[in-house]
């Protein structure tokens, strides 16, 4: 598995959080966040808490595999920003925690397991406006199977990326997971170029290496905000808007540090930051959404069943791997 480690120096604590003891000076964080988000947010955590953060950055699936492998001797304190269904499916690896501002979380984003919501994420299409004219943009998931898009669509591998698994499950929620639904997805799959990293997908589209990318709204928004030749498309046949999650690791070496990290991530200041600068949807009731994004009440949303997505993961991954093997 491919992992990237970032070690960040602590900054002075503020009155927002209690100063940690010497035993609490370092918190170990495993995250699927892209490097630019980690680099933007971690200094804010350190200013608020005075702690050092050791960050391991990897795909969602690799993170879960690593936590499971380390189960007898956990190395991580907290998992930050991976697919909620992965956390739901691996609930036994997680430690339950009710954060200080739990009641501020919108009920729609609360889960049933030992994980907590972090932000709201929306699955979208991202298109390169130099490679496609507006009339050529895909409007639905089934449009992605059109012959003109052969080798023009970038998607992360669903066995490595939590967001890619959400995209697969979104498609199967809309069209069913019967043989007919999988047959429809197979037609789309034939047009895909697979990446091992979900963070690479929007970059490929922005740079013109792909005409279309299946990605998260916030990843696409950063390139729109940066002036790239890209546009965000919300599928007319429906898409998913769900929480990505975070959780304490069971047996964490610094449980108090992990709790402090989660409290910080759910704070009003952090939620405002991830919304206004990073394009995520807030999970707090009192947070203001980003005005530049399409209001969710104007997006056709499906009912995304996180528990079913977790329960079906192995079955879906077996079928996904069959598709990969048959390419």
Task: Report the location of each language-model feature.
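Extracytoplasmic ligand-binding site segments that recognize negatively charged/polar headgroups
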Residues: 32-39, 61-62, 68, 75-209
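Periplasmic-binding protein-like
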Residues: 107, 121, 184-188, 193-194, ...
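Short alpha-helix C-terminal cap/hinge motif
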Residues: 40-54
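Extracytoplasmic "Venus flytrap"
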Residues: 25-41, 56
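An extracytoplasmic/periplasmic, membrane-proximal ligand-sensing/linker region
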Residues: 178-180, 282-327
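Mature extracytoplasmic/periplasmic domains
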Residues: 249-305
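A bilobed periplasmic-binding-protein/Venus flytrap-type ligand-binding module shared by bacterial periplasmic
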Residues: 124-131, 172, 243-254, 273-274
């Amino acid at each position: 598995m491919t992992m990237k480690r970032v070690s960040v120096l602590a900054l002075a604590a503020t009155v927002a959080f209690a100063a940690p003891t010497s035993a609490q000076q370092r918190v170990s964080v495993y995250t699927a966040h892209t490097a630019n988000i980690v680099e933007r947010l971690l200094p804010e955590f350190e200013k608020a808490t005075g702690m050092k953060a050791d960050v391991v950055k990897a795909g969602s699936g690799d993170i879960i595999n690593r936590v499971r492998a380390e189960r007898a001797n956990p190395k991580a304190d907290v998992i930050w920003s991976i697919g909620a269904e992965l956390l739901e499916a691996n609930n036994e690896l997680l430690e339950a925690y009710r954060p200080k501002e739990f009641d501020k979380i919108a009920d729609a984003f609360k889960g049933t397991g030992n994980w907590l919501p972090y932000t709201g994420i929306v699955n979208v299409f991202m298109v390169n406006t130099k490679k496609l004219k507006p009339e050529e943009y895909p409007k639905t998931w089934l449009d992605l199977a059109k012959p003109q898009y052969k080798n023009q669509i970038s998607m992360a591998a669903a066995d490595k990326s939590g967001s890619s698994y959400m995209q697969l499950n979104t498609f199967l929620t809309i069209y069913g997971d019967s043989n007919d639904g999988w047959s429809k997805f197979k037609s789309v799959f034939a047009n895909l170029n697979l990446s091992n990293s979900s963070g690479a997908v929007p970059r490929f589209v922005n740079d013109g290496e792909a005409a279309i990318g299946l990605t998260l709204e916030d990843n696409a928004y950063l390139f729109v905000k940066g002036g790239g030749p890209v546009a965000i498309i919300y599928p007319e046949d429906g898409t998913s808007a769900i929480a990505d999650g975070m959780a304490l690791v069971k047996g964490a070496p610094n449980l108090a540090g992990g709790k402090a990290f989660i409290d910080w991530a759910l704070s009003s200041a952090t939620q405002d930051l991830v919304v206004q600068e990073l394009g995520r949807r807030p999970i707090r009731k009192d947070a203001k959404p980003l005005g530049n994004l399409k209001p969710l009440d104007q997006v056709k949303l499906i009912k995304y069943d996180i528990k079913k997505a977790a329960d079906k993961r192995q079955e879906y991954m077996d079928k996904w791997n069959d598709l990969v093997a048959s390419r």
